[in-house]
């Protein structure tokens, strides 16, 4: 008789099964899913992608998102596919088609936040109904004990267009009934009322009905019985498990009973609906809203003017977006609920790899990536069937297995069974933590380095002078970024800064050594150190094993902050330094030590949004010297990439992260690769650029408006506009059509609001925005300007095409997995989202690929023809098709190949970069 299989053996078998089908993509193709591009649309694309040489389809988020979502990053239900994308049958048909062609499916996963303020998010609705006693209260990162007393045990909902009292008395907040449940509505938004507050409404109805129906009426008796049940519910502040279970059970029974009563008793229904109508008040009679005000004040949430969010919001958000609430996947039950369906897809082989969105928002990214891999193993074991025993024992066995593998392995490919890449933005010298259980980043580090190769670094001083002279100011990138961080922390993310400051102040009260530090002082040093941190975040999770990387960046931030603030006590900076590095744990009681670690983890979740909002979404729209460099993950203050630095990055990638993704355009980039390739040309023609600026400024001076006695747009925004126009002007166009005009207006309005100099999304200046819109239109309508502009544009466009083809070839040949963003296999002159989500003409791309196949025997002739007509984009598709075919024919060169920089000699040496790759007796030179 065979002995039973041990849990350890089952783990080993599951890992072996996953490893056997582990896919490292050969090349990925990113598709943006929405109601206009569904699973069926993607299925129709598969033969084209396969013919092009794509190995893995890469999908944007596919789980159920908020109604109307155009991007899918506002998931409201992780247990369902997004119905606007199609059915399960549609998705399975897509997965089957990929499998038939030996293609994989890489899925974009959003574990940091969910879309809320919509009834499609049942977890959030339950929190609004039940407050801290909701089973999902710990799913979201809510501070139920904020400093403001009125918000204790309540969540702030900053959704109102005006002050609460104004909105209330305008009659825009209305109670409605659905069956036996009550809600408050505000336009399309609908929030549940807590059952604790139902008696307020039902008691008066019962009293009124007694006179009409008589005390002995059975329906009135049932209503009073329901009232008693509701009054005996555990309050929403009672968080004991048994009370939560009782409340969840009994409130639903009470609502069902009320719904049944209303169906059989027209008098009760009529009386209740009349009471609701009275409760909703009459505009013009402020006192008529008093009862509704009392009812709303009894809810586990507080409706508020949207501007209140910056100062008082008490749930963690994705950046400053109120409609995206952070979730706590560090809690095992939350992780399982969020990833359950995803892991079933992985175990079944429907999904073969993952892209993780915004990992820097997570409590402990390193632990999360490890948990992803372990969860894939557990899901595989469950799918294999049989008795898996105790879940905790299984989890422990999986962890022990990987611990042993880590201790004995030399190659990470031998350890982790699931291909995972992370949307991690690295600074120029910042390494990706080597312990993370993944294959690398999504490629912004490559984008930055490769993009910079096409900028002439020797022209930096000249270009800086041109920029400074034109805008009549000398801007310092680091100073702008620092000030932008301070600004963001005093506006959009003020409430987050206040929350972690309060957290630390409460900790200091537990130590006689530190209790004299004031809240104001602590908030000040947290703000200054955060503003001085040169990276998105650190990854400290325990006093043991703090990396040299994290220690270096914390110490550097503290030193820089102290230097900038000589008037602030050094004791405060020293305390914060020791706290962030967990050096002072022994000076606190054990319970306080846990809170101190929690503060450090919260601070690390805070610094990433500060960096993103202040640098990517503010400074990048202010410092416009050469906006080809103003890209996600890039460093505009560094004018180009020296070839040695590019080679070093590739050497490090082939050694540490050989399967990391390589990106040149994404759904998040500020400009497409082709736009950046054009704008980079300006660095090689500074004299011509300066002369053009002078002519265009003179031609267009009269087209500006006047705002606050100053010309609008200002010269910095004008400088940005000319670069943008050169970047996006359609190939072969002799005038701007309405589509281009609308795109440029939309972009410039977004740019000036993101810059936050003259206008912003929070405080819009309509006069300035109207001046910008008018300027764009008048410039494009001016035949004299267009006539002067076109020769410069054509020259820039020609060399931009050369740049883009070279960049494309680099992406397809250096170490890593090349990713192609939808449509960029031919020229695509797109700007920031939503401009980069415009429809792609796949019929045109298929026709060009068919032409290449049809004339395959004359590749040299094709190359000459396409190069001679490069403006039509066929040359780019030809380069991609040729390079991907070469990759497929020589997989070892790209999976295991070495990377060796080559010295370039000759007159054009400074314009060339070369390298060799070797593996298994094969070699190639680029």
Segments predicted by a language model, with ranges:
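Catalytic domains of carbohydrate-active enzymes, especially glycoside hydrolases
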Residues: 42-65, 341-353
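Carbohydrate-binding surface patches
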Residues: 875, 905-926
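C-terminal amphipathic alpha-helical interaction region
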Residues: 807-808, 822-825, 908, 923
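Alpha-amylase-like alpha-glycosidases and glucanotransferases acting on alpha-linked glucans and related
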Residues: 2-26, 30-36, 68-74, 79-106, ...
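C-terminal RecA-like lobe
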Residues: 546, 831-874
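Flexible loop residues that form catalytic
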Residues: 62, 359, 425, 825
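Amphipathic alpha-helical
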Residues: 776-795, 873-900
